[in-house]
């Protein structure tokens, strides 16, 4: 890597995925050094699951992949931004973005798939 990344004590960084065309924020997840390397190698977003403690490719089971157009790093090197072309919905709940609710609980996003049909 040509930029130093400041991984936290768990050796992770927060990663925001943003639709490269619309600018919509799709999701927030975490990446390890291996996830960043795999994303660069394949051109598809990879993340690190803190709950499963494993590397995962976005869309690996759903087919709703994120093709990376560019990876950006914030000024402190402690967060990254994936600019992506999203295939299908970004959220495992079936919505186009994980940010589909207001703080008051109003739904502002669009449900684009039924998660029960994808995740059995």
Swiss-Prot record:
Record lineage: Archaea, Methanobacteriati, Methanobacteriota, Stenosarchaea group, Halobacteria
Query: Which keywords accompany this UniProt record?
Result: Amino-acid biosynthesis, Cytoplasm, Histidine biosynthesis, Hydrolase, Magnesium, Metal-binding, Zinc
Q: Which cofactors, if any, are listed as required?
A: Mg(2+); Zn(2+)
Q: Which family does it belong to?
A: Belongs to the PRA-CH family.
Q: Which InterPro entries match?
A: PRA-CH (IPR026660), PRib_AMP_CycHydrolase_dom (IPR002496), PRib_AMP_CycHydrolase_sf (IPR038019)
Subunit structure and binding partners: Homodimer.
Q: What is this protein called?
A: Phosphoribosyl-AMP cyclohydrolase
GO terms (molecular function) for this protein are: magnesium ion binding; phosphoribosyl-AMP cyclohydrolase activity; zinc ion binding
Which positions are annotated as binding Mg(2+)? Answer: 74, 76, 78
Q: What is its EC number?
A: 3.5.4.19
Task: Tell me the enzyme class.
Answer: hydrolase
A GO BP annotation: L-histidine biosynthetic process
Q: Where mainly found?
A: cytoplasm
* Record Gene3D superfamilies: Phosphoribosyl-AMP cyclohydrolase (3.10.20.810)
Which residues take part in binding Zn(2+)? 75, 91, 98
* Reactions catalysed, as given in the entry: 1-(5-phospho-beta-D-ribosyl)-5'-AMP + H2O = 1-(5-phospho-beta-D-ribosyl)-5-[(5-phospho-beta-D-ribosylamino)methylideneamino]imidazole-4-carboxamide
| Record's function text | Catalyzes the hydrolysis of the adenine ring of phosphoribosyl-AMP.
NCBIfam families noted in UniProt: PRK00051.1
Q: In which pathway does it act?
A: Amino-acid biosynthesis; L-histidine biosynthesis; L-histidine from 5-phospho-alpha-D-ribose 1-diphosphate: step 3/9
Matching entries from Pfam families are given as: PRA-CH
What HAMAP family does the record point to? HisI
- What is the organism of origin for this protein? Natronomonas pharaonis (strain ATCC 35678 / DSM 2160 / CIP 103997 / JCM 8858 / NBRC 14720 / NCIMB 2260 / Gabara)
